[in-house]
Amino acid sequence: MAQIDFRKKINWHRRYRSPQGVKTEHEILRIFESDRGRIINSPAIRRLQQKTQVFPLERNAAVRTRLTHSMEVQQVGRYIAKEILSRLKELKLLEAYGLDELTGPFESIVEMSCLMHDIGNPPFGHFGEAAINDWFRQRLHPEDAESQPLTDDRCSVAALRLRDGEEPLNELRRKIRQDLCHFEGNAQGIRLVHTLMRMNLTWAQVGGILKYTRPAWWRGETPETHHYLMKKPGYYLSEEAYIARLRKELNLALYSRFPLTWIMEAADDISYCVADLEDAVEKRIFTVEQLYHHLHEAWGQHEKGSLFSLVVENAWEKSRSNSLSRSTEDQFFMYLRVNTLNKLVPYAAQRFIDNLPAIFAGTFNHALLEDASECSDLLKLYKNVAVKHVFSHPDVEQLELQGYRVISGLLEIYRPLLSLSLSDFTELVEKERVKRFPIESRLFHKLSTRHRLAYVEAGSKLPSDSPEFPLWEYYYRCRLLQDYISGMTDLYAWDEYRRLMAVEQ
């Protein structure tokens, strides 16, 4: 196992216009302060205020959006990071681990990773993801990429259909089809930060949001040693070269994770579990009393000193005593949140320290709060009650189905842009208006300048006389639509769908 030295991981250089020379502790901290400014002032963060956490198109400002959730995750991440550093200081290990002059950057990377962790999520959350992937699967049929004979391939896109005698090109076709049918919010976050927003963050800061290490074009089983880390796609084919450079800069082996990402993940797990239940009470899906009974029933028999007793029962009893001039709901969730944090944060911090050799190497194949402990059971309790009583509620399911329909409908509306031939679409991009394509011209005008420029730049890097060019061009054209639609807020997607479907406002 390699020696633990965080100076080899907290890389303050950038992809473009990187600071040069040896830096003092203060200068390095200023570099990460610059990262904070770039992130907090980015449009991608602002858009989170109109993206779903659990309840789509919610007008009640007390119910969480992706932005307020991310701010809560940021605070919990800061708490865990400080707890880890405090414990390492007590153990006199800060200097041994190369952290004595990097405590500020350590905390900042965790905080900003937490704030950014959802920036790639499409409108309507996981149902938006499912809509994008289902729509592309119905046209690209990635499952046919291994079909024999090749005439069985049902892909409706000529450039991506498998052909006899073109094996090198066929392998690229397989990768592209698989990649486009595995849109994922975490992978889109990497694309946003690097390709679309050009935020030029430090290597360490980007490493903090690379939650999953599986490429989106992966086919087959994942290695047992990395099955958790590769549970979902973490980056796209379009960012393959960037991620390869990232691994080199952060000394990460293939499919390994950046150490501070485990802290971001734990902060998210702790935050959303309690928050989803609180939002459900705010939405009147159930009362606090009903929630307590749901939690009690799901946990089962317990001793007086059990974690359930110390966290949930304690919160319930204190809220009923009404010692403060606050509603029972407010008091219950205040105590529940405090009790939960006071138990889970120190536990997550100690898990990080206990498993630091594997975490530093990037190979720890679990979440920090995923084990056989009562702390893990408490998180599972919150999640299970939310799944059973919140996510399955008719109002929630109806809104999710509407969200799925909106995203599917928008993709269908913009489909004419994908139906154009390479030469026709190239002409449209160059002229922006082509008389014989009135619908396509108007659809093209609606695409954002940022996304159009990303498409043009990607194409300009490819030799147009290469046999691979038509494949890559179509890939980036599909990315153009995925980028545009996934970047919408819930409300904008809803309004855009209604406008283009000529539905009454």
Swiss-Prot record:
It holds the Pfam family HD. Keywords: Hydrolase, Magnesium. The keyword Hydrolase applies. One of its GO terms (molecular function) is dGTPase activity. The keyword Magnesium applies. Its cofactor is Mg(2+). It is an enzyme of class 3 (hydrolase). GO terms for biological process: dGTP catabolic process. It comes from the Bacteria. Belongs to the dGTPase family. Type 1 subfamily. Homotetramer. This is Deoxyguanosinetriphosphate triphosphohydrolase.
